[in-house]
Amino acid sequence: MTAAVKDEISRLPVTRTCCRKAEVSSILRFAGGLHLVSGRIVIEAELDTAMAARRLKRDILEIFGHSSELIVMAPGGLRRGSRFVVRVVAGGDQLARQTGLVDGRGRPIRGLPPQVVSGATCDAEAAWRGAFLAHGSLTEPGRSSSLEVTCPGPEAALALVGAARRLSIAAKAREVRGVDRVVVRDGDAIGALLTRLGAHESVLAWEERRMRREVRATANRLANFDDANLRRSARAAVAAGARVQRALEILGEEVPEHLAAAGRLRMEHKQASLEELGALADPPLTKDAVAGRIRRLLAMADKRAQDLGIPGTESNLTEELDDSLVG
């Protein structure tokens, strides 16, 4: 899915100048390098998609006023696909200062430039967009799903973690075999970050694959009922569904919508776990929140039934399910 995300965000229109500057600065930091050629600074950025390279070349010209050349490197050696190098020779030293690759005295800046680090939320989004275009990857949803960016050093990694924090997204910096990386593993956080990057089509595709995988995993668990604990959990879930059905009958239109929604989820997915119900909720809920809402729904219905002198929620239980508990 990495290629799909990069293709989509390479086509994303960005109009605010500060965001375009932040994106260029980030791409040059994560995909680029400074070289001294005949005493002059030459800037190079190596990308794996032509669309991202053309976007960078255009923005360098339109925002910073510098021409660049685009060099295509054919596959060979360890490279499976073509690589695209954007090179700035004339004005390289000036561009290095403009984008925060070096400070006013010409000393290299290891992380992201101050104007990006302390910028607005849109600058943090742009920094992540640039970093992902430069060296990002997204794995398929599953146990080891992750969104990851390879970083040029620990300072850049920490700056990217800080940018994620400003977007309320948990990311971790780690060093693996001498390479600094920033990783986002939580499924919800990955979806939120992709949305922030502007990869809306990719978010839908990723979430759909994630949901299909979870449904398959649930089906496999339900098909393998050798484990007694799993059987008890499933019976308890079915029992809760039966009690919820009776609760909704008792309360009718008096039930609060958020409790009714939790109850309907329990009825529609009788053998799902509370965690799975939470993932199906809109917006998603924790398993404790789902359990709490179902408990309140049943308690409200049983109190109402007692006041009216009619059978409560447990009247819907068969003998087999009579001892089961919610979820």
UniProtKB/Swiss-Prot annotation:
Residues 273-306 bind DNA. Residues 317-327 have a biased composition (Acidic residues). GO terms for biological process: cell division; regulation of sporulation. Keywords: Activator, Cell cycle, Cell division, DNA-binding, Repressor, Transcription, Transcription regulation. Gene3D superfamilies: Homing endonucleases (3.10.28.10). This is Probable cell division protein WhiA. Belongs to the WhiA family. DNA binding depends on WhiB. InterPro entries: Homing_endonucl, Sporu_reg_WhiA_N_dom, Sporulation_regulator_WhiA, Sporulation_regulator_WhiA_C, WhiA_LAGLIDADG_dom. Signal peptide: none annotated. It holds the Pfam family WhiA_N. The keyword Ribosomal protein does not apply. GO terms for molecular function: DNA binding.
